[in-house]
């Protein structure tokens, strides 16, 4: 490949369902490689599997890529010099390429029925040979006779005439030299009996027509590579470079799936992972970046990306590391941004009334400023912010008895309630001064009042700073909750 050629890479998914995290990582590696080298990133939709490909999946796929922050220079919605970018709209291109291969003798019409193919493979197994189809009588059939049968409407496929000797070898940027014995590769189908192309044929033709310089894809495609190389050579194409990215596995070293908690972009979005955090984490996963840092902007990741540094071993997905990165990105968001994220969640979960949230957005901004250091997922927000809204709380019985069972607390909580109620200003400083003042009068550490007061006002034993929290909960709610605790203490039979 000429060194002066502009880098052109493609991400070419089949739209058959949600976008798996392994596919997103492959897309990211293509995008990073293109951006690093000032190249072109192409999105190509490989939708020739008409039974499984759906328009809904195409749209979902594009949404997922855009959500995580990927843009494409050529492809659906943006066009480009090699349009169209959906394989079902490029069928004539594949048929022309097939005719060229037929005319050159590199391919042939195959009329074998499914029953013939089954018998061929059974016989090969019985004779101790690999069940590899090599064309039978059709491989060397007179081209004129084959064409006559085609014109008569006889069902057929078009197969590649695989060399029976030698090896097909390529240099994988990630794995090094990879080779296949040609004798182990059967005469593979190029065009199905329906006239639609197979994956290998369409991919090779498209890669050449779109001038792809580097094919960066999952390692489940390694066995496809010799077939595509054969097609390229038979058509006189310049070969792209190949790099096969290992799979993403769960901690149990099995392919990451829903049983591990999340597997698709949508899963992670639904579980409160920010797009920039998922981008950052997946770009680092098995990519060979120096371990001294973990948080990078996309431009920094592209600048540091080295395809040859990508590990040849499967990448093990570490949810805790992703959550740690996600927490960093949550902390980097402004309280205003977090409030915009939080409002619909709080309303949908029934934590707060939509009208109240809209009327008092500045308060929600302050709540998010208080809570953001404690969040790992955005979906933590409704639980974390719940005690700022509503009136009375549901208290855990065991913890209630632990917090209010001590004589000092029972004796002094009523006085604390009276002093808090009498405060002229409901501010964190005023609340703190009140609590610490009473504790000092009683010659006790402030913690003897702070812990039960936290539980009374939030229903939690752990929260953000108590006094700031009480200020934001508000005087009315705090006093109502403390009064509720006092009433329960006076009436032990009252249910929690």
From Swiss-Prot:
UniProt cross-references to Pfam families, sorted A to Z: Anticodon_2 (PF19269), tRNA-synt_1c (PF00749)
Biological process, per Gene Ontology: glutamyl-tRNA aminoacylation
Enzyme class: ligase
Cell location: Cytoplasm
Superkingdom: Bacteria
Predominant localisation class: cytoplasm
Classification via SUPFAM superfamilies: An anticodon-binding domain of class I aminoacyl-tRNA synthetases, Nucleotidylyl transferase
PROSITE patterns: AA_TRNA_LIGASE_I
Known function: Catalyzes the attachment of glutamate to tRNA(Glu) in a two-step reaction: glutamate is first activated by ATP to form Glu-AMP and then transferred to the acceptor end of tRNA(Glu).
Protein name: Glutamate--tRNA ligase 2
